[in-house]
Amino acid sequence: MASDSSFPGASSNVAEYSVSEISGALKRTVEDTFGHVRVRGEISGYRGPHSSGHAYFALKDDRARLEAVIWRGSMSRLRFRPEEGMEVIATGKLTTYPGSSKYQIVIEQMEPAGAGALMALLEERKQRLAAEGLFDPALKQLLPFMPRVIGVVTSPTGAVIRDIIHRISDRYPLRVIVWPVRVQGDTCGPEVATAVNGFNTLPDDGPIPRPDVLIVARGGGSLEDLWGFNDEIVVRAVAASHIPVISAVGHETDWTLIDLAADMRAPTPTGAAEMAVPVKADLQASLASQSARLSSAMSRFFDQKRQAHRAAARAMPSADQLLALPRRRFDEAASRLTRALFVNTQKKRVHFDGHARQLSPRLLQRRLVELERGVTMLGQRLPRALEAFLRERRTAFTHRANRLSPEPILRRTRLTGSTLEQLDRRRDQAVRLLIERVKRRSQELDRLMRTLSYESVLERGFAVVFDAQGKPVKQAAAVSPGDALSVRFRDGDVGVVARAGLTIPDPTKGQ
């Protein structure tokens, strides 16, 4: 390479590098000098893994910033999920990126910078979610007493699921549906939230039944191991669940945010199974005890009612005592009824005799003769009256015809002739109707006369007694011993001689 002696220092022995050479030299120097380093800093700009699985962010403190990258393989081995603002200790190699003259750390391992940092982050998240009401006790749901299906969100290969299934089988065997998830690592939180939401979206009548209660379980571990159950998406999913949730994460001394959002917290996964289902043997014993108590109570109840019935029966008067007064009243009413019937019959007979005297056959016959005579007279007078009327009208027509022209007279004559024909027809019809009415009335009177006649009484099996003069005998007092009497029956008369009078017994006496 040519040198220009006009510039100062041009003849020195300083090596000359291209940009690529100096960048490569810097890269080798940094990597050789800082092989493995541990860097403490706060995560900044973290947006989660890229679609490739790698994660890009920065570590910073109050004076500097260091770009960082975690390749997919290392990302999957992390024991916790990185979050924005979390203070961590990253272990890895420093390197440079020649394309932009930047240096960065390629992280191979990363852990939270002590429990204090995680606890501070956890407390801040707890306060924020509590302010939203996600931990409100009023939102807690009651666990069903006897669930049919239990959903378990846990690892399918750990001892936790075996303990839960074994405990449920011992207490109250029922159907258990397991939704397998990772219970540690970067994907723990999203998988648990997906499982809780997935159980809630199951239809009641689908091929996979919808659980009546959920158990989210994991064994014990450090704060970093349990960090996935502090994830905000897990807390929101559990708080929004329409299915009651039991959290059983870690040991009794461990606590996570899911414990605050769940409807019930169990100290262990086995304890969660005990909370979820009752003991079948206890239920059977309780049922037997309740049945025995019910039988005993029913027996006592029936004994009390039986004793009360006996006491009431002893205090109740006998049937004869209860019926004595009504029976006496009935007997008195029966005795009065016979007399009342007799008196009423006598009154009705007197009333009937009065009407019968008013409607004697001779009176009816006389009335019938009068009606027939009236009808005959009307029949005789009507033709003469009509004839006189016609003669009068003809005379009037004749006088008028002499004074009027022929045409009007002819018209009026024709009209009058038509009127006369109508009058003739109406006369004939009126005479027929009158005669029919008189005949019907005569027939009715004749039937009434036959009905009221003593002969109809004879037809019904009675007899009429006549004295020697042929007059009917109406009272026994009018007959003396030795009088000759005639008894008329339906088919003839029989002569008899009266003996001493007999006293008619009073039907009301001797009752």
From Swiss-Prot:
Biological process, per Gene Ontology: DNA catabolic process
Catalysed transformations (reactions): Exonucleolytic cleavage in either 5'- to 3'- or 3'- to 5'-direction to yield nucleoside 5'-phosphates
Pfam families: Exonuc_VII_L, tRNA_anti_2
Entries under InterPro entries matching the protein: Exonuc_VII_L, Exonuc_VII_lsu_C, OB-fold_nuc-bd_dom
Assembly description: Heterooligomer composed of large and small subunits.
HAMAP family: Exonuc_7_L
Biological function: Bidirectionally degrades single-stranded DNA into large acid-insoluble oligonucleotides, which are then degraded further into small acid-soluble oligonucleotides.
Name the UniProt record assigns to this protein: Exodeoxyribonuclease 7 large subunit
Source organism: Brucella melitensis biotype 1 (strain ATCC 23456 / CCUG 17765 / NCTC 10094 / 16M)
Gene that specifies this protein: xseA
